[in-house]
Amino acid sequence: LRILEPGVPDVEQVVSAPYAPVRDACARTQFPGRFQCCMIGGKHVVFDVAHNPSAIHALLHSLTHCYPERSVCFVCGFMADKEYPAMLNALAGVAAEIILCRPDTIRAALPSQLSEAVSPPEECIVTAFESVDAAVAAALRSSPDILCVTGSFYTVGEAMSALGVSPVTSLT
């Protein structure tokens, strides 16, 4: 998207459209579940379908940029065929709490598998629940400032449904 930045030569020739309408269209574009933020019960909640190590690192960068010095509780559920040990251990490096869960799909890793894969520092609390609903309910009762639901699309979708959050916001 660098081509959409002001001052990039020949933007209008490359995209065959004036710069301002393209910029405005991009500003209105929504990516549900991609660093989607809202407030629920006085708690900042972030939904992000980070389901590979690169996406987890991007999520962590965004969290530290947008919420510096804030404690984070992660609700995580991953598919069994993903690199969840690397992702969980990256999260554990910054998390105050990690709540593991299993979305309702046969492809999902079991909470016990996730728990065995993570080696958190002493100050990071790790718990596990058999469902996303139970994990989210526990996370809302937790003390960290930020609740971040991440992992698979299934996990984020179930959490959004449990919390009554729409995947898109109205632009009107």
What are these regions (language model features)?
Residues 49, 77, 129, 149-150:
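Active-site-adjacent beta-strand anchor residues
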Residues 1-97:
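Nucleotide phosphate-binding/pyrophosphate-handling subdomain across enzymes
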Residues 80-82, 106-107, 155:
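Glycine-rich phosphate-binding loops at beta-strand->alpha-helix junctions
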Residues 6, 44-46, 88-146:
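C-terminal helical cap/extension that packs against the catalytic core
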Residues 56-57, 84-86, 110-111, 158-161, ...:
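Short glycine-/acidic-enriched loop or helix-start segments at secondary-structure transitions
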Residues 134-164:
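A glycine-rich beta-strand to alpha-helix segment
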Residues 8, 23-26, 30-33, 99-120, ...:
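Flexible, gly/pro- and Lys/Arg-enriched active-site loops
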